[in-house]
Amino acid sequence: VLVDLPGTAVRREDIEAWEAETGVTISAGDALFLRTGRDVGQSGGYHPSLIPFFKERDIALLGSDVPQEGGQVEGVQAPIHVFTLVSLGVHLFDNLGLEELAQTANELGRWEFMFMASPHAVPHGAGAALNPIAVF
């Protein structure tokens, strides 16, 4: 699911308003992608207050065109990374190129698609470059 909300730290009310507007509901097992508009000079990210929402909706993967962080929690460096990876077991895809995906989604009027990714095998690695594919 692509949520296209550039230029803001996205909070629960933003996602719920987006769901009402698009008719799309983020559900268990979804891969959730946020386009912040980084590549066109805008910025934003997931606000840490969304962490309970991620748990409630039981998402499987979280991605964005930025390193995810749209706000801070006192005493916690990179709260989205810490809480989603460690506490929820959610996979993270940072710094994705989402402009073409957003353009296609807008043209089709569709925000849901099949997502696949093929990472490079890195023995004992904790992260790797990958080839993401969205099929509408």
Where are these regions (language model features)?
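Active-/binding-site microenvironments in catalytic and ligand-binding cores
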Residues: 1-136
